[in-house]
Amino acid sequence: MAFVDVDGVRIHVQDLGDGPAVALVSGFGLDHELWDRQVRVLTERGFRVLCVDQRGHGFSDTPLHGYDIDRLAADLVTALDRLEIGGATVVGHSFGGQVAFRAAATAPELVTGLVLVGSNGVRASRSESFPFGEPPGPLLQSLLADEHINRVGARYRTIESAFAHEPDPRTVDWLVRCSLRMPSWAAVACYRSLLTTDLLADIERVVQPVLQIIGATDPVHSAKGARWLRRHLRAATLVEIPDCGHYPMLEAPDAFESALLKFITA
C-alpha cells in the first residue's frame, strides 16, 4: 500500500508485483477491491499492478473540491510519475475510463497503452456529436436527487441495474460497501463531471494502442458508442463480450482477462 501526495491530497495506490506496469482505475464509487481477481492473475503472469483509488474513492482522501476530469487525470498522472514506473498500460472502468482517456491524451509518455472497460472514454451522455446514451440534464438531476434523498438506496439501485442479469446479492452488498466509502459531496461532484464532460477533442491526441472491452448488453454505456469510438481512434481493438453488462471483470472474468492479457502481452 502506498500513498502519493498530490497538492495536499493523498491518493491511495495498491502497488503489487514486479514487471511491466498495469494501472487499474475503477469507476464511480468503486476502488481497488473491484480488481481483486485481476490483481492476482496479472501478478502471477509477471506484471506490476497498481490499483489507483481516485480522490473521493476507496482509501484516498475525500476533499470537498477537485473532482473535474482534468484534476482526476492529473492525480493519476502524478501518481504514476512519482512511483517511477516509466510507463504503464492504464485500464479504466466506466468513469475511470474517462479519466484514463484524458491521462492518455495529456501524458503519452506515462500512459503507453489504454484499455477502456465499460466506457466510451469520451462522453457518458448524449450530444449532437456523440448520439449515444441519454441526454445529460434529466439523468443528472435524477441522480443528484437520489443521492440527496437516500444515498444508500441510490448506490444499490445504480449498482444492481448495471448487471446484465440479476446479480448475487452478496456481490451487490460488497460493491455498495465499497461505494459508501465515497461521501456524498464527492459523489455529486463526480456525477456532474461524468455527465457533463466532453473529451471528443482528445481523440486526435490519443495515439497509443487502445483496447475497448464492453459488455454487449451493457445498460450504462452502449456497444454502439464503443463501435463509434473504435472507428475514430487511430489504433483501437474492440472486444464485445456477449450476454455481459457493465462489469466484465465480475460478470465474465475469463473472457475479460483473456482479452486484457492478449493486449498487454502483444
Model segments located where?
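Acidic catalytic loop of the alpha/beta-hydrolase fold
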Residues: 217-221
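Active-site loop/oxyanion-hole signature of alpha/beta-hydrolase fold enzymes
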Residues: 39-40, 44, 50-95, 258
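Conserved alpha/beta-hydrolase catalytic His-Asp/Glu region
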Residues: 125-131, 146-204
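Conserved HGGG/HGGXW glycine-rich cap/lid loop of the alpha/beta-hydrolase fold
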Residues: 9-65
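Short beta-strand/loop motif that positions the catalytic acidic residue
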Residues: 206, 212-214
